[in-house]
């Protein structure tokens, strides 16, 4: 008798994606982040759904409704902190996943990589809109500052900003539409993640050596299901410690004050996971130039397959490129730190040097290193 998972139309899909999928025998723990991101998305959609049952997207009651969730709803405080810190967990996994892709040359699978970049943009948009919903001080001013950046677009900028706001300032209409978009986008992300997987399974997974692994494949289940489960248990342990012991560690104290359009916080900044891009934005004195640099800081990932010069795919045996990769990681961490600092010396110049280094490493130094390594290996 044929096994049902191999014949049933629906189970056949699951079987080909998660059970009988041929996977390279040597992929390391760095390949766990795909499943961890899936888990984060499920956590966020579930906790968000329960929060939406009690939240009211109205400027007069939004802040109070979040307070009500924390004080009066059974385990509301837990759901709220799971959702708030779940976003941080999502971005930690996302950045590690992208770092893995750069290190091991996974960007060679261009369709998968480009869908991944779209997923990153969608996730950033969702997180930004979610940050506005509690209607605290940083929610309001963050929304005002970031949406106002669109006014730098020539000719249509001002009209575009007023169209997004639904008026002449961030107000009830803005909050309402941000709630609607914040609710629908995670489902679009889930659909795009399916497309991401579809393209990945067309080519098969990359591996640490960066060489074809068709001659040595093993079934995904039980080997990698077990491995993924271990990763999920470890990550959930870390996550629950964060939620239950340090729930406000990654948040901003200003967001515990209700939004007040008449009182500007001394230092407006986004959540920690956007600080690197915010630092790049601030490092350019011109408004339009800053917006372009901000977009390019993410869009530059799409150039990686086109500026790859090395004959080897992975950085595993390329010491110069390895050094540059870790220099890039350090640079992003410095940018994250600078983004959280006030705009004053010496932070301004540090931010400008770090921003210039970010683009120089990716656009110039890494391709040059690839050529040098080819010469060293006589390829």
UniProtKB/Swiss-Prot annotation:
Identify which cofactors the protein needs according to its UniProt entry.
heme b
InterPro entries annotated for this entry? Cyt_b/b6_C, Cyt_b/b6_C_sf, Cyt_b/b6_N, Cytb/b6-like_sf, Cytochrome_b, Cytochrome_b_C_euk/bac, Cytochrome_b_N_euk/bac, Di-haem_cyt_TM
Positions annotated to bind heme b b566: 97, 196
- Which Gene Ontology MF annotations are present? metal ion binding; ubiquinol-cytochrome-c reductase activity
Keywords, comma-separated and alphabetical: Electron transport, Heme, Iron, Membrane, Metal-binding, Mitochondrion, Mitochondrion inner membrane, Respiratory chain, Transmembrane, Transmembrane helix, Transport, Ubiquinone
One Pfam family of this chain? Cytochrom_B_C
Where, per UniProt, does this protein localize? Mitochondrion inner membrane
Q: Where does a ubiquinone bind?
A: 201
Swiss-Prot/TrEMBL GO biological process terms? mitochondrial electron transport, ubiquinol to cytochrome c
SUPFAM superfamilies recorded? a domain/subunit of cytochrome bc1 complex (Ubiquinol-cytochrome c reductase), Transmembrane di-heme cytochromes
Q: Which residues bind heme b b562?
A: 83, 182
For whether the record's keyword set contains Mitochondrion, the answer is yes
Q: Which PANTHER family match?
A: CYTOCHROME B
**Something else known:** Heme 1 (or BL or b562) is low-potential and absorbs at about 562 nm, and heme 2 (or BH or b566) is high-potential and absorbs at about 566 nm.
According to the record's subunit comment, the protein's assembly and interactions are:
The cytochrome bc1 complex contains 11 subunits: 3 respiratory subunits (MT-CYB, CYC1 and UQCRFS1), 2 core proteins (UQCRC1 and UQCRC2) and 6 low-molecular weight proteins (UQCRH/QCR6, UQCRB/QCR7, UQCRQ/QCR8, UQCR10/QCR9, UQCR11/QCR10 and a cleavage product of UQCRFS1). This cytochrome bc1 complex then forms a dimer.
What family classification does the UniProt entry report for this protein?
Belongs to the cytochrome b family.
Q: What protein name does the entry list?
A: Cytochrome b
């Amino acid at each position: 008798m044929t096994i049902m998972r191999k014949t049933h139309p629906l189970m056949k899909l699951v079987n080909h994606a998660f059970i009988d999928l041929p996977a390279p025998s040597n992929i390391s723990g760095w390949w766990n982040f795909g499943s961890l991101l899936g888990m984060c998305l499920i956590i966020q959609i579930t906790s968000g759904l329960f929060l939406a049952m009690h939240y009211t997207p109205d400027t007069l009651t939004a802040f109070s409704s979040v307070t009500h969730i924390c004080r009066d709803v059974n385990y509301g405080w837990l759901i709220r902190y799971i959702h708030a810190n779940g976003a941080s967990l999502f971005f930690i996994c996302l950045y590690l996943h992208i770092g893995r892709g750069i290190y091991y040359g996974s960007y060679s699978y261009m369709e998968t990589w480009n869908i991944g970049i779209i997923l990153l943009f969608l996730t950033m948009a969702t997180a930004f809109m979610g940050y506005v919903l509690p209607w605290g001080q940083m929610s309001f001013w963050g929304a005002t500052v970031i949406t106002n950046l669109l006014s730098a677009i020539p000719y249509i900028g001002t009209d575009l900003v007023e169209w997004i706001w639904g008026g002449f300032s961030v107000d009830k209409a803005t909050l309402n539409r941000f709630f609607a978009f914040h609710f629908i986008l995670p489902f679009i992300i889930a659909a795009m993640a399916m497309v991401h997987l579809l393209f990945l399974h067309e080519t098969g997974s990359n591996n640490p050596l960066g060489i074809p692994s068709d001659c040595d494949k093993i079934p995904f289940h039980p080997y990698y299901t077990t491995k993924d489960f271990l990763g999920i248990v470890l990550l959930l342990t870390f996550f629950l410690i964060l939620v239950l012991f340090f729930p406000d560690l990654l948040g901003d104290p200003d967001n515990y004050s209700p939004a007040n359009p008449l009182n500007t916080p001394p230092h407006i900044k986004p959540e920690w996971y956007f600080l690197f891009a915010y630092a790049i934005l601030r490092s350019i004195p011109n408004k339009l130039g800053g917006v372009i640099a901000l977009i390019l800081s993410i869009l530059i990932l799409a150039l990686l397959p086109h500026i790859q010069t090395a004959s080897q795919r992975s950085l595993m045996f390329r010491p110069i490129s390895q050094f540059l990769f870790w220099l890039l990681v350090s640079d992003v961490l410095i940018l994250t730190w600078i983004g959280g600092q006030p705009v004053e010396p010496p932070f301004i110049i540090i931010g400008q040097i770090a921003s210039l280094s970010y683009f120089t490493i990716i656009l110039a130094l890494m391709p040059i290193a690839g050529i040098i390594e080819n010469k060293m290996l006589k390829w």
